[in-house]
Regions:
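Secreted, periplasmic, or luminal enzymes acting at the cell surface/secretory milieu
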Residues: 47-181, 187, 207, 212, ...
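Intrinsically disordered, low-complexity Pro/Gly/Ser/Thr-rich segments with frequent PxxP/GP/PP motifs
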Residues: 194-230
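Glycine/threonine-rich flexible loop motifs
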Residues: 6-25
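Terminal connector regions
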Residues: 223-265
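Short acidic, flexible loop segments centered on an aromatic residue
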Residues: 177-194, 200-202
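A short helix->loop->beta-strand "cap" motif at the edges of active sites that frequently abuts
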Residues: 37-42, 61
Length: 265
């Protein structure tokens, strides 16, 4: 196995550390491609302080381990993760774009006038790129594990009164032979509101530890606070209308439910 350490210098980020591109120096991409020709499994460990353009690196390696700037325990942590002494369970707090030209790419960006949806995907006059997918390469909340998990969300009510809480019940099972942890994430979308609202907002999450074959049930309560926002008058309000609830293991890998909220508060 080849463990290939790539990334940024720490002075390339932070205050007064702006760059015009989020690609690494080209020599690092060339090195990754060369190492792949050696016929050995390649694991890239990535040291960086920001999301990078990593598509080429991911495609020229067997695994990519995001370490950020890990400090003095970097060697021990890396050895534990790669040897299996520790099981990865972290999730990305930022989306990684397909390419530099896709930034800014946020999971919670505001809706556009002609958003791309599964129903109109492929049409020309919707908000999309012609040469790359709309989705980031690695979405917010993404992260892999040596374990494999299966999620099942109980049916949600179709209607909800203003001021009431929405209860979400999720059953998670470790269907692998390795003990591990997974992060269940719950997002919310206000489909139509008096002001432009994000396409998705993280409202709840919980990291669950499971032994091999173990199953647990996790319950979330989304109170009226989760449905509320500040309007143009800077008043915190909850408005009626259709809401979408997303439950999954990242901002993209989700099951979708619709709940109609009625009345005014």
């Amino acid at each position: 196995v080849v463990v290939l350490a790539l990334g940024e210098k720490n002075e390339w980020g932070g205050e007064a550390g702006s760059l015009a591109t989020i690609r690494l120096p080209e020599a690092q991409y060339e090195l990754a491609k060369f190492v792949q020709t050696l016929g050995k499994p390649v694991v890239i460990t990535l040291f960086n302080g920001r999301p990078l353009e990593v598509k080429e690196l991911a495609e020229s390696s067997d695994a990519l381990l995001e370490l950020w700037f890990p400090g003095t325990e970097a060697g021990r942590v890396t050895a534990d993760l790669l040897s299996g002494a520790s099981n990865p369970s972290g999730k990305l707090s930022m989306s990684f774009p397909q390419t530099t030209g896709q930034i800014p790419v946020y999971y919670n960006h505001l809706r556009t006038g002609r958003p791309q949806t599964p129903e109109n995907k492929g049409e020309r006059y919707v908000s999309h790129y012609l040469d790359i997918p709309n989705e980031p390469f690695y979405p917010f909340g993404y992260g892999k594990s040596y374990s494999e998990f299966e999620l099942k969300t109980s049916s949600l009510p179709k209607e909800l009164n203003l001021g009431e809480s929405l209860h979400v019940e999720v059953t998670i099972k470790n269907i692998s032979d390795i003990a591990g942890k997974e992060v269940i994430q719950v997002y919310l979308q206000d489909v139509t509101a008096s002001i432009s609202r994000p396409v998705k907002e993280l409202k709840a999450f919980e990291k669950v530890a499971l032994q091999a074959g173990e199953e647990k049930t996790v319950r979330f309560e989304l109170t009226s606070e989760a449905f509320s926002f500040y309007n143009q008058q800077l008043e915190k309000v909850q408005e009626p209308g259709l809401h979408r609830v997303f439950v999954g293991t990242s901002s993209e890998d989700v099951d979708v439910f619709e709940v109609e909220v009625g009345g005014y508060v």
